[in-house]
Curated annotation (Swiss-Prot):
Stated name of the protein: Nitrogenase molybdenum-iron protein beta chain
Source superkingdom: Archaea
Coiled coil regions in record: none
Cofactor(s) the protein requires to work: [8Fe-7S] cluster
Subunit and partners: Tetramer of two alpha and two beta chains. Forms complex with the iron protein (nitrogenase component 2).
The encoding gene: nifK
Biological source species: Methanococcus maripaludis (strain DSM 14266 / JCM 13030 / NBRC 101832 / S2 / LL)
Sequence positions that bind [8Fe-7S] cluster: C21, C46, C104, S145
Catalyzed reactions per annotation: N2 + 8 reduced [2Fe-2S]-[ferredoxin] + 16 ATP + 16 H2O = H2 + 8 oxidized [2Fe-2S]-[ferredoxin] + 2 NH4(+) + 16 ADP + 16 phosphate + 6 H(+)
Co-factor binding details: Binds 1 [8Fe-7S] cluster per heterodimer.
GO molecular function annotation: ATP binding; iron-sulfur cluster binding; metal ion binding; nitrogenase activity
Zinc recorded as keyword: no
Matches recorded under CDD domains: Nitrogenase_MoFe_beta_like (cd01965)
UniProt family annotation: Belongs to the NifD/NifK/NifE/NifN family.
Amino acid sequence: MSELNVIKKERTAVINPIVTCQPLGAMYAVSGIERGMPLVHGSQGCSTFVRYGFARHFREPADIAVTSLHEDAAVFGGRKNLISGLGNLAARFKPDVMGVVTTCSSEIIGDDVAGFIKTAKVEIAKKMGEEAANKIKIVQINTPSFVEHQFKGYDNAIKAIVDTLAEPKDEENGKLNIIPGIVNPGDIREIKHMLSLMGVEGILLTDTSDPFDSPLRPSKADKNPYYQKGGTPLADLQDCANSLGTISLANYANSAPASLEKKYNMPSKVSEAPIGIQNTDSFIRTVKKFTGNDVTDEILDERGIVIDAMADVASRYLFGRKVAIYGDPSITVGMARFVAELGMIPKVVCTGVKNEYFVNDLKKVAKESDEDIDALFGQDLRALDVYLKENPVDLMIGSSDGRLMAKDLGIPLYRVGYPVYDRVGYQRRPIIGYNGALNLVDGITNTILDKYYETQDWKLQQ
């Protein structure tokens, strides 16, 4: 009888963490709004660290403003910084949406962020006029960095955006809200591709595909401000209250669907990322259920191509190989199920998040695959390192942060998740959907071939 063995962290210290702080998730979410600008209410390092991480992973600049709190703010508060910061952004960039993202310092100080925003709106109206000021929406996003992680920050941001901007109307718009989670531009494009094949118009909450992978073209605007192409328009964010339903593709992003369901009686579904055959099938069925649209031959063809690719390589190269997976709780569960579909053994799955969905979903994977799985629950890469020294595997799947561990242990690493900074092009290649599954089949198999098949074996492969 297969079972899930949950291993919790015994020590207090965190060594080589898998997660980072809440504001990153909020900044990511706001960056997916067309003409949206995150304003970090904290020190300069709070924004610099995230911009640096985004630049390494996405190979794109990120426009993130900061109120630049210093030591005096710890005594006197950050009122002046936030009010002047909002005013400067409004005057110079004229954004459609400004997301005020709190941090450790502003939360510990106890700044009245809501009150400061009200004052800032009055000041902006005085300088720009009532009409211009009313066009700029300000969203307060509380993300205390000293608790939780970037996934909670993302969840808080999406809920704040929906609660602040959604405007109900008398009629449904026939659209479907999709919360993608913290994924890559290639993944979001794949989501839009699948919806398009089914004739479904989606509202992405939010769409970071173009903002983090934009074309390099001369600006059509003759003057500043210049914004990256794309993002979810403000009109769509306001219209999300009138959609047919909400699907969250990340089990940690459940607050916004619950809020929409409670306020507007809108059906919702929170699930794992649609990675692999079973999870993508589930996503397609949910879309069909909410919209009534049929599954097209094009989608079935894409599914068939993946299954054909799996049949080509699974039994020959992958069957029975043990895998260690670490990272995002939603992606790791999806990857665990997919490697099991390939005939591999998800020996250990590690996440830095204490998320009960993670444990419950992994129990299902263990039962389906009929394999025992060790779950490092709320752990770090040091715990995974210690585990793998005693329980060796054939393949590691996770972010670039595990590259040195993989090298020391002599285990090949297939890079998935955030951040990936020692390979190029990863952010453009989906791992979601059937096309994403095809990329994973090829990538995982080639990684195995690089390590375990020597030149003397090549003739046997011909």
